[in-house]
């Protein structure tokens, strides 16, 4: 009996979503890239204020136990939390393909305990280490462009997003053991070499993502 009741609730929920899809005011987003590229799961919510304006926010979380790849190329206990409030402006509110320009603030906090790996110090010397505690703080502002790709009668769709902005990043290592100078990497992506660089820096920030969307 409980099984049939759960099935009834499940189908009633999606029937309601389908019925409201033509007059949706809310969108739930799930990032397709974040678990594999950013080592965290990202879920967002958008709310329609009027024909032109939407507001929303994204929350992201990851640990070494739940993400499919190692966080920050380190082995050990890792945790990432990120929040990104955002304001959207619809460029073509009457179009089936919704075009948005948005301003997004973001804050990221990453903590690593008893991790092992490799990194650049502030003098561009490359080291390996057997154990350390790690902290990364990143915050900044992006300007984004995104497109809502969907059918008006459907509750599901896609939203590619691209943007750029500025960010401040602070990385520190403490309680380090087994530190040794190592050979700098010569293969892989160039920006990946310096992703764990110790110290603080202010640089451009780029944002590329693909969202699965659920309208209701």
Where do the PLM segments sit?
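Extracellular/periplasm-exposed beta-strand and loop segments of Gram-negative cell-envelope proteins
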Residues: 31, 59-82, 110-138, 168-182, ...
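Outer-membrane beta-barrel "beta-signal"
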Residues: 88, 202-216
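Membrane-embedded beta-strand positions of outer-membrane beta-barrel proteins
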Residues: 28-32, 57-59, 85-87, 99-105, ...
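Transmembrane beta-barrel strand/turn architecture of Gram-negative outer membrane proteins
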Residues: 79-89, 139-148
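Repeated loop/turn-to-beta-strand initiation elements of outer-membrane beta-barrel proteins
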Residues: 52-55, 95-96, 151-156
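Transmembrane beta-strands of outer-membrane beta-barrel pores
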Residues: 32-36, 59-65, 89, 105-111, ...
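Short glycine/proline- and aromatic-enriched beta-strand/turn motifs that initiate or cap beta-hairpins
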Residues: 19-71, 211-215
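Bacterial Sec-dependent N-terminal signal peptides
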Residues: 1-24, 212-216
């Amino acid at each position: 009996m409980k099984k049939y009741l759960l099935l009834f609730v499940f189908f009633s929920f999606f029937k309601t979503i389908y019925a409201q899809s033509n007059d949706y005011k809310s969108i739930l987003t799930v990032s397709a890239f974040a678990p594999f590229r950013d080592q965290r799961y990202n879920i967002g919510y958008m709310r329609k204020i009027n024909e032109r304006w939407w507001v929303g926010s994204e929350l992201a979380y990851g640990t070494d136990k739940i993400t499919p790849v190692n966080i920050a190329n380190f082995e050990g206990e890792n945790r990432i939390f990120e929040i990104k409030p955002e304001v959207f402006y619809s460029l073509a509110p009457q179009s089936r393909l919704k075009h948005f320009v948005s301003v997004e603030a973001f804050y990221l906090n990453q903590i690593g305990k008893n991790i092992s790996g490799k990194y650049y110090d502030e003098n561009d010397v490359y080291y390996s280490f057997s154990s350390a505690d790690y902290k990364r703080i990143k915050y900044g502002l992006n300007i984004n462009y995104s497109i809502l790709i969907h059918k008006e009668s459907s509750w599901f769709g896609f939203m590619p997003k691209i943007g750029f902005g500025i960010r401040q990043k602070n990385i520190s290592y403490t309680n380090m053991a087994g530190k040794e100078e190592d050979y700098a990497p010569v293969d892989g992506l160039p920006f990946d070499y310096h992703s764990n660089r110790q110290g603080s820096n202010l640089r451009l920030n780029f944002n590329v993502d693909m969202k699965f969307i659920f309208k209701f």
